[in-house]
Amino acid sequence: MGGQPQLPGTDGVGGIEPLGVSSTPLVTGGRALEQRSGASNSNSMNSSNCFQFPSVLLTNANHVLNKLDELYCIVSDRRADIICITESWLDSATPDALCMIGDYSIYRKDRLSGPGGGVLCYVSTAIQSYVVSPVVSASSEFEILWVLLRPRVLPRPLSCIVLAVLYVPPWYNVELSRALRSYILSCVDFFRTKYSHPSFIICGDFNSFDTDFCYKLLHFKQM
């Protein structure tokens, strides 16, 4: 679309039992949004022939510890740069060592109260990455993990990719929907101020949460 960088190899899957992925980019329960870069330099866009955004694999695990063997097989087959998992069902009693994958850094946001929920993210060690925390308060009713990615090569003028992995519970209400909408808008504004020309990937299990504002106000596009 107009020479904008694309996000190939993005798989979105929700409500899967057992763990699995689909070749279809979007299905019910899984979405990935990528910011339009707005770059107009034709030379830099032509160079996109030798550049690809990191590939992203998204799945809803419903207890990842019970499906690690399946996860290892999928990772070996797909070789995605980034693996995003919702409903990880991990808690503070679960050490990272139990769910590590070779050649990937692991990041997680566990549910603080009650069973279920939680998000988990694996990033290839070939990509510099670390957790970032926006100075914006978030409701404990949803889990969201922010990770900054600095691939070795990015098309100009992008300086980094801000990845968000989000899980919205199915019982969310109008009040929570408004709070989440406000939170995402504030976080994107925060990161745009903090970093020069960041690109964004927001993915996860949104359930019935309406993401239209991402397209209308933030100029994201659904992949």
Predicted features, each with a name:
Residues 1-223:
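A shared catalytic/ligand-binding motif for oxyanion handling
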